[in-house]
Amino acid sequence: MLLAMYEDPQGRTTPGLWGRIACAWAVAFAALHFFWALGGSWGLSVSAGPLAEERPGWFVAVGLWGVGLLCLVGGVLGWLLAWPRPRGRAGRMVRALGWCACAVLLVRGISVEVLLLTDTAGQGMDVSPEQRLWTLLLWNPWFLVGGLVFGLAARGSGKAEGLSSGAA
């Protein structure tokens, strides 16, 4: 259905789809953070280590609620990237923010991956083997996927011509 909504004259799927995928990625990440903020624990212990058990107020407020809200802002950005870009400064701003989201997510994913694989941070980081494994196999790839999706959405921003009318 989504693919049928955005087709260019040559019959290829246009990049507007990537904006919708970026939106879904961000909203899913927000939902997970809100689940954790409300007391859920699935996956948090291997992500946040001791903070997951202690749950200090600053961690819940900033690390869970704050990040969840930031992810919702990312969802709005992904949605905006899916639609025809407004002319002028607003359109350039949306696209620039898409590229910024791409860069931040890729840098975060790659840098943490490199730090964990090379053990550059040393023993001072207090990262358990279980945390390291889940971070390398699940969390960092999630950031890398998000970065790639936002990059593809920003690259194609403004190229979508809107919903096809169904007429050939």
Language model features: what each stretch is:
Residues 2-15, 80-102, 160-168:
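Cytoplasmic juxtamembrane regions at transmembrane-helix boundaries
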Residues 8-12, 32-64, 85-86, 122-130:
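Interfacial loop at the N-terminal end of multi-pass membrane proteins
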Residues 24, 30-31, 39, 55-80, ...:
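Core segments of alpha-helical transmembrane spans in multipass integral membrane proteins
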Residues 28-40, 103-119:
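C-terminal TM-helix exit segments that contain a strictly Trp-centered aromatic cap at the helix terminus
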Residues 33, 75-78, 112, 150-157:
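Structural signal for membrane-spanning alpha-helices in multi-pass inner-membrane proteins
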Residues 115-116, 122-125, 131-132, 165-166:
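Mitochondrial intermembrane space
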Residues 141-161, 168:
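Membrane-water interface at the C-terminal end of transmembrane alpha helices
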